[in-house]
UniProtKB/Swiss-Prot annotation:
Gene: moaC
E.C. designation(s): 4.6.1.17
Pathway in which the depicted protein is active: Cofactor biosynthesis; molybdopterin biosynthesis
Protein name as catalogued: Cyclic pyranopterin monophosphate synthase
Subunit-structure text: Homohexamer; trimer of dimers.
Substrates-to-products reaction catalysed: (8S)-3',8-cyclo-7,8-dihydroguanosine 5'-triphosphate = cyclic pyranopterin phosphate + diphosphate
Highest classification ranks of the organism: Bacteria, Pseudomonadati, Pseudomonadota, Alphaproteobacteria, Rhodospirillales
Function in brief: Catalyzes the conversion of (8S)-3',8-cyclo-7,8-dihydroguanosine 5'-triphosphate to cyclic pyranopterin monophosphate (cPMP).
Pfam families reported for this sequence: MoaC
Amino acid sequence: MTDQPLAGFTHFDAEGRAVMVDVSGKADTERSATARGSVLMQPETLALILQGGVKKGDVLSVARLAGIMGAKRTPDLIPLCHPLMLTSVKVD
């Protein structure tokens, strides 16, 4: 078995098996990331949300919390993603 990755693919070994890249030699660096998404809905649904008329509560606050939780759990959701210390997460 060889540890040399397939040409151009750092997350696969020479046999094509998925591997987690060794980042122990990397220096800590400041990083920033931006994600964007869209939610499609009926105009009536949007009006209810904006008026606070949804019976189950504040939809936008729950969505904001879900975005923050998603950022915190990224290594659990994306295969082979290294956990990084987060200092801030903002959801607009």
